[in-house]
Amino acid sequence: MKKIILLLFLFLSCYLIYNLTEDKSLSCLVIGDKIADNPYLKNNTIINKYNNNYINQDYRITDLINIIKYNEEIEINNKKISIHRLLKNNDILIISIGMNDIYYKLNDNTKNIYTYINDMVNNMEILLNEINKYTYKKVIIIGYYNITNKHNDLFTYLNYKMKRITNKYHYEYLELNDILKNNPSYLQNSNNFNLNNQGYNEISKIIVEKIKNY
C-alpha cells in the first residue's frame, strides 16, 4: 500500500512540475493580405514565434491557392523555406484573404455580383481543403467588412457563405463586419479597407481571447 501511495505521489509531483514548466507559448503563421499581419498579435506574450512571410497586400484567393499548390519557396535567414513546411510547423494559422477580390469587383461594376461571390466562395473552399491537410490547434479565418455606405446585403451574403464553409472544416470564422462596418476610426482612410493601429489592436484582442487557452 505504501508503495502505491509513493508511486501516486511521484506521479502527481511529475505531472505538477510538467504543467508548471511546460512552454505554453504558441507559434503562429499568418497568410494572405495585410489584414492578417497584426503587429499587436506579433508582440503578444502568448506567441513566441510569428511568421508573416506569406503576406502580400495584393493577394487574392487564387494567389494563395497557387502558392500552396505549387509549394512556393521563399528565403528566410538565407535559407529557402517552402509554404508546405511552414504550414506543417505552426500551432495557429490565421488567414485573411478575399478583401481584394470583393472590393475589386465593387469598384469595377456590380454586374453578376452574386455569381462573382459564389465563385469566391468556391475558391475559398479549394483553399481550405488544402489547409485541411495540415493539423493545427486553431485555424482562424478573418471575415469581411463593409467600408461603403451601401452593399450591406452583399456583405451579409458573403459572410454567411464563407462562414458556412469555414464551419464545415471546424475552423473559426472571425466576423468583423459589425465591429468595423462604416467605422473610419479603425481604418487608415475611409476609402480603403486597410486598418490603422486602432483597428489592428481591436482585432488582436478578439484573436487572443480565442487562442489563449491552447
Residue ranges and their predicted role:
Residues 31-32, 142:
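Short hydrophobic segments within beta-strands
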Residues 17-24:
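Sec-dependent signal peptide cleavage junction
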Residues 25-29, 35-119, 194:
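Conserved SGNH/GDSL esterase-like catalytic core that processes O-acyl groups on lipids
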